[in-house]
Amino acid sequence: MKKVLLLVSLVTALSSCGGGGGGGGSSQTGSTTPVPNNPNQPGNSNAQNPTQPGNNQPGNSSAQNPSQPGNNQPGNSNAQNPSQPGSNNPSQNQITGKGVSVAVLDSDFISPDVHTNQLYHKESYLGEILDREFKDRFIQETKSSDPNRNNLSKNNHGIIVATILGGNSGTGATGAKIHGVSVSQGSGFYLDVNKYQELQNKGVRIYSHSFGSQKSFRENPNYREEFRIYLRTLTESILTTENDRRVDVLTNFYKNAVNEGSLFIWAAGNRRFDGTNMNGVSVQAGLPYYIPSLYKGWIAVMGVRPDGREYSPYFARADWTSLQEGVNSAKWWTVAASGDCEIDGCTEYGSSFATPKVSAAAAKIKEKFPWMTGHEIQQTILTTATDLGDPGVDNKFGWGLLNERKALKGPAEFSNELLVGESAARNGAKGQFNANIGDNITSKFENDITGLGGLRKSGNGTLILAGKNTYQGSTDIESGTLEIQKENGSPITIKSGGTLITTPTTIIGLKNSHYDNFSPVNVKNEGGTLENRGSGAVITGNYTATAGSVTKAEIGSKLIVNGSVNLNGGNTTLQTLSNGRYITAKSLSSTIIEAKNGINGNFDKMKTPELIKGSVEKTDNQINVKLSRKNILEYAKETKADEMQQNTAQNIESAFQKLDEEIENGKAGNLSSFEKKAATLQALDLTNRAAILDSLSGQIYASAQALTFQHSQTVNKDLSNRLVMLGTLDNVGDNFGLWVSSFGANGKLEQNGYGKGDTKVFGGQVGIDKQFGDNLILGTALSYSKADVKFNRYGGKSDASNFGVSLYGRLGNKDIPWYLQGRFGVGFVDSDVERDIILSSNDYSRAKINHNDKVYSGYVETGYDIKNSNGDFVVTPFAGITHDTVARGSFSEDKSQFGLKADKKNYSQTSALAGVRVGKAVQWNGGSKTTFQGYVTHQRAFNDEDLSFKAEYSGLPGSSFKVKGIGLSKSKTKAGVGALTEVNSSFGWYVNYDGEISSGKGKGNNNVVTTGLRFNF
């Protein structure tokens, strides 16, 4: 609340002091505008600065200040009515000028003791205002490099102007970066070219000036003389030759800056020193009258009431002194805007406060259309203004009242007077609006565009014309894309780097409003691309395609040409595009071009989407295509796809055959969603083919089962190592033994032609066992682990939680050479699977499902210990049989039409193994014993389990096919080392490493590290 009161106090103080003749209120009309007050003079709060010429002229007192509420002017109560044309409506338009730099050249932004500061005795007040209104968006520019400029005005006019333009309390460009440039010197102003150039080098391209001479641009033909007071310091007296030189330096900067895309926005002015009306904009605002090349980067802003009516007495008009049509009239670069301050508590008005509204609009346009230079921004602001006064561009209001909302929809006219200048336009020159749109940028012009000028589309970006356009100049698409959505009355030429897109509502023709018909307009394709989307587009004239041109047509679309189609020269291409329509294996014939006056020539070649084959046929006035889909498996083989991709292609082909059958039998009504996605899939291209086929493989549901088998064998090996350990213990416990272990494993699942999976397993077991008699030990164990696998090639990932129960036993002890040991276990697996399903570069989804599995495991091993005479070294040949059964639960990927749905499936593998183990016991002085062990074993399965399963796509019931993945390896070689230390009769610890290498179909490896403790009781 304190800061709000401070701001109100600021604007109240400013209002009582006068805002500036070129801008805020008539209290400054007796001087160069805006004229700051001298706060050091007692009682000067309501008087003009007496040092200014003409200040003693009658009528130049506060009595002329029209800033009081109401001001006896009807309609002024609507000064802040957001419904007025051009007002900013944040709920409808969130464009704020973000990222755009605007320079505000005005009175004083840097003096620490500005007027309000003195009134409130708060040295930090200026900083508080700037911080609250702009935060880090305000840059206080340094003073001029001229050492003689050290007498700043200490006036708040510039802060108010900047706040209207971009402050948080205003409705302007609240996201723009504001460069506050203090150009005041005492009660005047100093234009420093070096400061201009510094701003230009910082990237500033929009310059806002709320000051200027109080003579209209036509009053003194020697405009250089009017610049004298702006190009010298207070103490200087310069000769005419020096003044002319300085003017040349300044105007040369303006010329160069305009050519670099800058836009200079000037207050038109209020009234003369003597209080009389200005019938033309100020000399500065009217500079293009003297230097015509500046026309494309200049705007003069006239201050009017919010509803467009003039104040009484009126402020500077556009060019009222030249009622006849004169060359370089300022009306061509003049626009009107509300001159009300429009900040709470501020009742000042004038062209000073109209100017920042136009500057704010320019910043917002620059944000929305970042490719626009000052010339395009100027045209957009001027041509979208709401007409005032006489119809069209007039000498009073210029183009009319600023309409920011409309301006943010793009230009409304391609005017030759703005494109090439008034003089050139009078001599018949025509210009083109240059839409030079950069890469990855799409802009839309929503206004109906009129005018005699044309359009040049350059740059690789896209421009969409969404209005009903009647501009008559030529349209040249040199590069990038132009999309026409409605009517367009301009002849179009598509150059080699350009693309024209037409839609079902496109009409290339000039609308005759009196007769409600269209005059013929031609389209010429000179090596570029015409792309017709949907049926209904009309070219009212002729369509000509020359050598190297491409004509694209969506499947099922038709382009109507009221004239003739001329396919001239060689190497013309017809290319069909997917439009969401599925093509069956049965041939489909459709007309893509129909010409009322016939077709001359034919296309030399035809291109279709990757999965579509077609041919072209020409009749007298039609071009028809016949299309059918390719066999997906044959296509995959032709492109040398690997095994996984060919399997995917076979599955898609099976589904498409089912879909074809349903369509031909008229039973596809419930399959429309799947049919649409199938059409999307048919549009794949070389850039995304591999990704699509990989993602649709579903291999993870097959391949991930290999991890379940691998995990079961990891648990099995941990228990096997414990059983071997029991055969070496001197003491297994009088009552029972308790052990706990933890293990970690990482490995790979891989097979030629499939995605590779990286596996990780972390878990542990806890067990208890008891010796029965001298030779038998029985026990039970619980295990819990987390296992995950991530596949490349869009295979997805699986995270599984495993809980298991095992029973184990060993017959034989360290004193008996022969032993028999085994284990039986049941595991419960909770698996979460995620994978991407890609149908096109823009159509992809992520499937997330859960399935619950069970694992049944059994292992039996027998061996014989061969010991040395000391009994501390042993060699043990052994053999065994292992069996695992995985019962995978059912799952359904319902969120995608091409998601997989499968019933539960059982997988089993039984293997035999043989190996040899060696051990060496070492007795330590403290009584402890460590047994070092190592082993190698080879395992071979009796069956070849490939882990494939039957599935169907969730969007196409009955489309059964086989999903394949990495199979189980038939042969594995394992090796390991470990150490068991019996610290005493009650406690021991152990560590093991086990490595596994698979060979054959399912190649891979696994590395397991196990540690554990044992307690005897």
Residue positions per predicted region:
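Outer membrane beta-barrel transmembrane domains
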Residues: 806-807, 898-1017
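Substrate-binding/access-modulating region of protease and related hydrolase catalytic domains
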Residues: 153-156, 168, 181-293, 344-357
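Outer-membrane translocation/initiation segment of Type V secreted surface proteins
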Residues: 26-32, 371, 383-386, 391-446, ...
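Extracellular S/T/G-rich loop segment that most often corresponds to the catalytic His/Ser-adjacent loop
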Residues: 106, 286-367, 371
